[in-house]
A protein has these predicted regions:
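Soluble "head" domains of membrane/secretory-pathway proteins
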Residues: 1-194
């Protein structure tokens, strides 16, 4: 079946051999634009509601660099580093909702389009809006090159089964245990229904 708005899908962009996981926000025929960081579908801004900021551990996969996340690193008393991220709950026209990260009010993808999604194509965006290689960007800017054809979408991503912090060695499976991000394992990727 065709993806629906809010689905998280696995895809390989045309002409590339790297898999991506992104969220479907635009369907064939939809007019998509982004203004001031707000996603607009068919002329209607998507509902956005700020949530409590979230602390995530700084690790090799989520380094929380000062360039990308100015003033967001926090050192706890035990010496551990954390990144404090603003979370925005978006609710799509079909009532499905999910959380996004939106740190920079003026990032390159915060103003885009409008574009009409072609037949049998889907407009995809990442939930980390300021740092996502998605349909807003051409491939030479590490994006998906626009809306993605149906045949390049492999299927839905349902859950995170295994998540490592980047400190493990491919050749040392024992290191996978210390690098496991247990809080992410077996969490759903699907949006909440309205």
């Amino acid at each position: 079946s065709d993806p629906e708005r809010g689905d998280v899908v696995i895809l390989t962009p045309p002409g590339m051999n790297t898999d991506y996981i992104k969220r479907v926000v635009g369907l064939p025929g939809d007019r998509i634009e982004v203004r001031g960081g707000v996603l607009i579908i068919n002329g209607q801004p998507v509902k956005r509601a700020p949530k409590e900021e979230r602390l995530i551990p700084v690790d090799m996969n989520d380094p929380c660099s000062p360039e990308d996340y100015p003033d967001r690193r926090i050192a706890k008393d035990d010496g551990s580093l954390w990144c404090k991220l603003p979370i925005i709950r978006e609710t799509l026209p079909n009532g499905r909702s999910y959380d996004t990260v939106d740190v920079d009010p003026d990032s390159p993808g915060d103003n885009f389009g409008p574009i009409t999604v072609p037949d049998r194509h889907f407009f995809l965006m990442g939930d980390n809006r300021d740092h996502s290689a998605d349909s807003r960007f051409p491939q030479w800017q590490r994006g998906l090159g626009g809306p993605v054809p149906w045949e390049n979408i492999g299927g839905k991503a349902e859950i995170i089964t295994f998540s490592l912090d980047g400190s493990s060695s491919t050749f040392n499976p024992v290191s996978w245990l210390t690098a496991l991000r247990a809080g992410r394992a077996f969490t759903s990727l699907q949006p909440k229904e309205g």
